[in-house]
Amino acid sequence: MKADAKQITHLLKPLRLLLLGAPGSGKGTQTSRLLKQIPQLSSISSGDILRQEIKSESTLGREATTYIAQGKLLPDDLITRLITFRLSALGWLKPSAMWLLDGFPRTTAQASALDELLKQHDASLNLVVELDVPESTILERIENRYVHVPSGRVYNLQYNPPKVPGLDDITGEPLTKRLDDTAEVFKKRLEEYKKTNEPLKDYYKKSGIFGTVSGETSDIIFPKLLNLITSKFG
């Protein structure tokens, strides 16, 4: 992975960004790079939150496990309650807040519910970007992907391997495979994603805040993503 350019320490207005993309398209990787590049930006990942809940075997975690293991998306009410509660708990429901959402909303119903909440606090989304990656590239990625669940750090045995095989670089704790990181589950998740993503894209296109960046690797996509952000907010 190439080193990123100089940090962006100031934007002309607060950025509230939603990243869209198929499972395995690299949303987590792009999020990590954006957080390093734009220090004042914070992030919230529905996937990371859910995996933490599953690991802790909370009521929400047990309920979510049934859907995730089958490659199904979570019901709107379940994920919406979780995310909106977390946004409030983090103090991000204010006009000056800068944040990035990964993995939520996934349906127009979720998007509408989120918009209503954010409008009440004058903190609406102002940029939605889809990561467009070939399906064959994504399948190869997930077959080689391992994660450190507590932190959400993601490794790939081909292009981003851990320093010590099977262990997290920072903590030395074991890495694991996600329940949904199999070819069979991926294909189910991809079909589910396609069904909901087109209406979601149309929803955000109408608001004039939607954009797309395409590429096969993180190093190709990230400069395009950064240029899109700086052209609108820099």
Curated annotation (Swiss-Prot):
Reactions listed under catalytic activity: a ribonucleoside 5'-triphosphate + AMP = a ribonucleoside 5'-diphosphate + ADP
Segments for region (LID): 144-181
Chain residues that bind AMP: S46, R51, K72, L73, L74, G103, F104, P105, R106, Q110, R178, R189
EC number from the UniProt entry: 2.7.4.10
Subcellular location, record wording: Mitochondrion matrix
Region (NMP): 45-74
SS bond list: none
Pfam families attached to this UniProt entry: ADK, ADK_lid
GO process terms (BP): ADP biosynthetic process; AMP metabolic process; GTP metabolic process; ITP metabolic process
Function: Involved in maintaining the homeostasis of cellular nucleotides by catalyzing the interconversion of nucleoside phosphates. Has GTP:AMP phosphotransferase and ITP:AMP phosphotransferase activities. Does not accept ATP as phosphate donor.
Extra information: Depending on the yeast strain, the GTP:AMP phosphotransferase is encoded by ADK2 with or without a single base pair deletion/insertion near the 3' end of the open reading frame, resulting in a long or a short form. The ADK2 long form (this entry) is also referred to as AKY3, while the short form has been named PAK3. A sequence of the short form can be found in strain S288c (AC P26364). The modified C-terminus in the long form contributes to protein folding and is critical for protein stability.
Family designation: Belongs to the adenylate kinase family. AK3 subfamily.
Protein name, UniProt field: GTP:AMP phosphotransferase, mitochondrial
